[in-house]
């Protein structure tokens, strides 16, 4: 049974109903509909913390989805799961792949910056300030891109950029 039929969450049910109506009204191929079903089931599993199931659904959605914009969100969500699992190198790879298909994903730039900042903090703890600065500089570049796409968002990042004199 598809996950969308067993989820008891009101918001998920509402989303599923609206999505099903749109899939009937908007002209789409059966492959696109199936890809969206896997994507929707992946989001549902991810929201419940069932990352293995979410990844299976996302990979299947990637196999079926042909639209680069839609693929960018699938890749972004795969990156989120890898971030949650502490697999930062894999997460960065998926965020990069998402941005290749959709360069207007500020949340991907933000998440990449957070990972780089975290790695900078780790380098400081290991006593390597030179490596830390390189990671912080990379974080700054990603945050600048996120802020440029959505001015007024990422206030903490904006403040960090100012405090560390990395904001131009």
UniProtKB/Swiss-Prot annotation:
Source organism superkingdom: Eukaryota
SUPFAM superfamilies registered for this protein in UniProt: TPR-like
A Pfam family it matches: TPR_1
InterPro entries: PSI_Ycf3_assembly (IPR022818), TPR-like_helical_dom_sf (IPR011990), TPR_rpt (IPR019734), Ycf3/AcsC/BcsC/TPR_MFPF (IPR051685)
GO CC term, one of those recorded: chloroplast thylakoid membrane
SMART domains according to UniProt: TPR
The keyword Protease is annotated on this UniProt entry: no
Database matches in Gene3D superfamilies: Tetratricopeptide repeat domain
Subcellular location: Plastid, Chloroplast thylakoid membrane
One record GO biological process: photosystem I assembly
Broad class of the protein's primary localization: plastid
Binding partners and assembly: Interacts with Y3IP1.
Similarity remark: Belongs to the Ycf3 family.
Protein name per Swiss-Prot or TrEMBL: Photosystem I assembly protein Ycf3
